[in-house]
Amino acid sequence: MAKILVIDDDPDFVNATRMVLEKEGHTIIRAANGNQGFQMAKQEMPDLVILDVMMDSVLDGLSTSRKMSEDASTANTPIIMATSIASTSFAEYFPTDEYLHVRAFLSKPVRPADLVRQVKRFLPKEK
């Protein structure tokens, strides 16, 4: 079905995401930080990216989403941002959607049904 790039430094999250989405027939590729993820997105041309906010630096995911939106080869790739930041006091300082280049947010821990629903929502329709 689809090739999905998961950019996250938490191997448990990546493995859980892989298990859920491979059951749906998707191929999962992984990057452990924003720079690696950006390079993989340019090389692999995934159908969708699931991106963590905080990895190497506090806002690594935000800078990665910005770089992807500014690069012609990745600008149209839908991004779902997965974060545990929504349940912290840091959330009030988080940029609003108008400053982000993402299609949706998922709060960690992510429920499998929510993950599947959001992925289906943003994948290109099958021909």
Language-model features: where?
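Short amphipathic alpha-helix used as the core "switch/output" element in two-component signaling
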Residues: 39, 62-75
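Charged docking surfaces used in two-component/phosphorelay signaling
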Residues: 15-23
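His-Asp phosphorelay/catalytic-motif detector in bacterial-type signaling
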Residues: 45-47, 73-79
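Active-site beta3 strand of CheY-like receiver
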Residues: 44-51, 55
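Alpha4 helix (beta4-alpha4-beta5 surface) of REC/receiver domains from two-component response regulators
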Residues: 59-63, 85-107, 113, 117
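Short hydrophobic/Thr-rich beta-strand motif most characteristic of the beta2 strand and flanking loop
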Residues: 25-32, 40
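Conserved sequence signature across two-component system core domains
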Residues: 7-8, 31, 49
